[in-house]
A protein has these predicted regions:
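N-terminal secretory/membrane targeting signals
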Residues: 1-29
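Transmembrane alpha-helix boundary signature
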Residues: 25-31, 63-64, 82-105, 114-131, ...
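Interfacial loop-to-helix junctions that mark the boundaries of transmembrane helices
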Residues: 32-44, 65-72, 94-107, 209-218, ...
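Hydrophobic mid-bilayer segments of alpha-helices in multi-pass membrane transport proteins
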Residues: 43-55, 69-85, 106-115, 260-270, ...
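Juxtamembrane and boundary regions of transmembrane helices in multi-pass small-molecule transporters
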Residues: 65, 172, 191-192, 210-259, ...
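Membrane-interfacial helix-loop connectors
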Residues: 84-86, 147, 157-172, 176-178, ...
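Core mid-bundle transmembrane helix pairs that form the ion/substrate translocation pathway
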Residues: 212-326, 482
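Transmembrane helical segments that form the transport core of multi-pass membrane transport proteins
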Residues: 270-405
Length: 485
C-alpha cells in the first residue's frame, strides 16, 4: 500500500518536473521570480479554488470516485497552475517556485505529520473507558494544555485515538471531534513557539520565546467559552444516546486503565526537540555562511534544503523508525492503525501547497498596501487568510507589515518594532482561525481522516465551516471587543 502511495506522489512530482524541464527557459529564474512576486495575475489562483471545491464537493456527490482518483485531481489542478505560470514567467521560475514550496514547506510539514502519526499510533489505552460529558471535557482540556508544549499536531495525534476509543459506544459523537479540532488542533497552541509554526517563525524573527504567554488571557477566555458550549452539547447528546439504549461495554470488572507503548513518549520528545532545533539552529553561526545565510544543499537556482531542516527530518524519521521497531504490532491493531489517513493528507496537501503559491505571492506583494493599521484589523485579516492559506507565511506577511509601520515602542523584532496589541492580534488570528476550515491547520484534516476511518461521520468541508461559523465566529467577535479594539 505504501509503495503504491509513493508511486502516486512521484507521479505528481514527475509531471511537474518533466513539463518544466521540457520548456525553453524564457527568462532567468531570479529575474522572473522578482517579476512573478509582484505581478501574479489573480486568474492563477483559480486552480487553488478548484482544488478546494473538489475537496469540499466530490466526497459528497462522488465519494467512491473521489477516494480512487484524488491523486489525479491533484495532478490536474497542479498542472493547471504550473503550465500557465511557466508559459508566463519561464520554466526555470516555475520549477524553482514548485521546488521552493515542496522543499521549503511541504517536506518538513509532511515528515512532521508522518512522524507524529507513527509514534502516536504506537501508544494505546485499554480498560473500562466510557466517554461521558465530564470525561470528554477533561480530555479536551488536557489536550488543549498539551498543545502549546508538544505542538498542536503532536497533541492532536496523541489524543485523537484515546478520545475516539472512550466514545466508541456513543451514537452522536461528531461534535466531540469538531470541538477537538477547535481546541486541541488550534487554539491550544498559542502559548509557545512550539505550539504552532507561525509562532516559531515569530521566535526566529526576534519575538522572545516566552512572550506568547501574553496570550494566556485570550486563550483562557476562548477555551472556557468553548468548553462550556461543548459540555452543554455533549450532555444533550449523551442523554439521547442513553435513552436510545446505547451503553458502554464495562462488563469486565477490575480492568484497570492502562497506557500501552508508554516508551513512545521518548520518541515524541525527540520529535518536539527536532522542531525546536529547526527554529534555533538557523541562528547559530555554525549553520550560516559568510553572508549570514543558512547553509544547505543547493538543489536548483536559489532553492536549497537547509542543514537545520535536514537534521529535523532525520531526527523525526529516526524517531518514527525506533517507534515501530520497539513497539508490539498488537498495539497498532488495537488502535485500528492504518496508513489511509496520512496518505490522504499527503496527497491533498501536496496539491494545496503547490496551487496556493499565486495567492501567497499576491499577499506578499500587496499585503502592505491593504491599509491595515489597527489590531482588530490585523486579527481578522490574518485570521481569514490563515483559514485557507498556510498560516505561517500569512503570519510573516502581517508581522512584516506591522514592523514597517514605524512604531517606536513594542516588541523589538528583526522586522521592526511591533506594538504588543498588534502582535497579539496577528498571533491569535493566525493560530485561532486555523480552526475555521479543515485545511486551516495541519492536524485538522488528520483528525477528520482518522475519525472517518473509525466510523465517526464527520461533516463535509462546508458542513464543518458551518460549525465554525456558528460556534467560533461569535467567540472571535468577543475576542475583538475585549482584547483588540
Amino acid at each position: 500500500m505504501m509503495k503504491t502511495f509513493m508511486k502516486k506522489i512521484l507521479l505528481l512530482l514527475g509531471s511537474a518536473a518533466v513539463f518544466c524541464a521540457g520548456m525553453p527557459f524564457q527568462v532567468l529564474a531570479a529575474e522572473a521570480g522578482s517579476e512573478a512576486a509582484g505581478a501574479v495575475p489573480l486568474a492563477l489562483c483559480i486552480p487553488f479554488a478548484g482544488l478546494l471545491l473538489c475537496i469540499a464537493v466530490l466526497p459528497l456527490v462522488k465519494a467512491e470516485w473521489w477516494e480512487k482518483h484524488q491523486i489525479h485531481a491533484v495532478v490536474l489542478w497542479s498542472l493547471l497552475f504550473i503550465v500557465p505560470f511557466a508559459v508566463r514567467y519561464g520554466s526555470g521560475t516555475a520549477l524553482e517556485t514548485v521546488l521552493e514550496c515542496l522543499v521549503g514547506d511541504y517536506l518538513t510539514f509532511i515528515v512532521l505529520l508522518f512522524g507524529l502519526f507513527c509514534v502516536s499510533g504506537n501508544i494505546g489505552m485499554e480498560g473500562d473507558l466510557a466517554g461521558s460529558p465530564r470525561i470528554n471535557v477533561g480530555l479536551l482540556m488536557l489536550g488543549t494544555c498539551l498543545s502549546s508544549w508538544i505542538g498542536t499536531t503532536g497533541a492532536s495525534m496523541l489524543m485523537v485515538r484515546p478520545v475516539i476509543k472512550m466514545n466508541y459506544w456513543r451514537r452522536r459523537k461528531s461534535h466531540i471531534m469538531i470541538f477537538f479540532i477547535f481546541l486541541i488542533s488550534n487554539i491550544g497552541g498559542c502559548l509557545s513557539p512550539i505550539g504552532d509554526p507561525p509562532l516559531l517563525m515569530g521566535f526566529m524573527r526576534g519575538v522572545p520565546f516566552f512572550w506568547s504567554l501574553h496570550l494566556m488571557p485570550v486563550m483562557a477566555l476562548n477555551v472556557a467559552v468553548l468548553l462550556f458550549v461543548f459540555y452543554w452539547l455533549d450532555r444533550r447528546a449523551y442523554r439521547k444516546d442513553i435513552a436510545e439504549g446505547c451503553k458502554p461495554d464495562i462488563s469486565k470488572p477490575g480492568t484497570e486503565i492502562r497506557i500501552l507503548g508508554l516508551h513512545n513518549l521518548i520518541f515524541l520528545v525527540m520529535i518536539v526537540a527536532a522542531v525546536i532545533l529547526s527554529g534555533v539552529l538557523p541562528g547559530m553561526v555554525a549553520f550560516q555562511n559568510e553572508a549570514g545565510q543558512v547553509r544547505g544543499i543547493r538543489l536548483y537556482g536559489e532553492v536549497k534544503l537547509s542543514y537545520p531542516a535536514l537534521i529535523e527530518i532525520a531526527m523525526i524519521l529516526f524517531a518514527a523508525w525506533l517507534s515501530f521497531k520497539t513497539t508490539n504490532s498488537e498495539i497498532r491493531r488495537k488502535n485500528h492503525f492504518t496508513w489511509g489517513a496520512i496518505q490522504e493528507v499527503a496527497v491533498l496537501f501536496i496539491g494545496i501547497f503547490i496551487t496556493m503559491q499565486p495567492a501567497l505571492m499576491i499577499l506578499k506583494a500587496k499585503g502592505a498596501e491593504l491599509g491595515i493599521t489597527e489590531p482588530y484589523q490585523m486579527f481578522w485579516v490574518t485570521g481569514a487568510l490563515s483559514s485557507f492559506l498556510d498560516n505561517t507565511p500569512t503570519y510573516l506577511v502581517f508581522l512584516t507589515t506591522a514592523g514597517s509601520l514605524g512604531f517606536s515602542s513594542g516588541i523589538a523584532t528583526t522586522l521592526g518594532q511591533v506594538p504588543v496589541a498588534m502582535l497579539e492580534a496577528i498571533s491569535c488570528g493566525a493560530v485561532f482561525m486555523g480552526a475555521n476550515t479543515y485545511i486551516g491547520n495541519a492536524p485538522n484534516f488528520m483528525v477528520k481522516s482518522i475519525s472517518d476511518e473509525n466510523g465517526i461521520c464527520m461533516p463535509s468541508f462546508f458542513g464543518y465551516m458551518l460549525w465554525s461559523l456558528i460556534f467560533l465566529v461569535p467567540v472571535f467577535l468577543m475576542d475583538m471587543l475585549v482584547f483588540f479594539l
